[in-house]
Amino acid sequence: MEDKKSRPGPRPGGRSALVQAAVHRAVRDIQAQGDAQQLTIPAIAEKAGVTPSTIYRRWGTLAELLSDVAVENLRPDHEPEDCGNFRADLLAWIEQYIEEISSVPGRNMLRTVLAVDKPQNRVQCTTYTLEQVEVIRQRALARGEAVPAGDAILDRLVAPLIYRLLFASEQPDRARIETLVDALLVDG
């Protein structure tokens, strides 16, 4: 009998990762068709080539699965643009971030992540944002610029803009964004 301790853990890119990728792809495909009635676990399972029980076992509910897919879709696909100085880098990044998040799909993804009691998904969204902010900060520090902490950028720039998007349904304009960035740079 094989000792459980000697068995390797899940392989990165193994069967579990392939199942997750297939299920996520099936969700995105069905969402792209625009028919919310078709977004069911049996339909997703059929499209992904897995059984519904596989989805229930891994995600539990449709809402949790949709939250996982939303988190994956919120992952940035490239580093922030390097514009030559911290202020310009931060402005370029936050404007693009807000443009993406304020789109109908972006708002829907945020609401989906927030609707499910799955704190690790919200933490992952924060991690993605902090990683982007940290790239900008490290570039600026390498240029010898003084920069605020990453948490200060989240609290004083990102959070107020996200709040307005979600609760005031307000698309922040460039003037508001610049005001927040400049206040952050003055007060650190």
Predicted regions and their residues:
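Basic, helix-initiating cap at the start of DNA-binding domains
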Residues: M1-K47
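HTH DNA-binding helix-turn interface
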Residues: Q33-A36, Y56-L66
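Short, basic, alpha-helical segments at the C-terminal edge of helix-turn-helix-like DNA-binding modules
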Residues: I41, A70-D77
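Short coil turns linking two alpha-helices in DNA-binding domains
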Residues: A48-P52
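Amphipathic alpha-helical segments used for helix-helix packing
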Residues: A63-A70, E100-Q120
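Hydrophobic alpha-helical connector segments
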Residues: H78-R107
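Amphipathic alpha-helical packing segments from all-alpha helical-bundle domains
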Residues: E99-E100, K118-R143
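Hydrophobic/aromatic-rich alpha-helical bundle segments in the mid-to-C-terminal region
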Residues: T126-L130, A140-L184
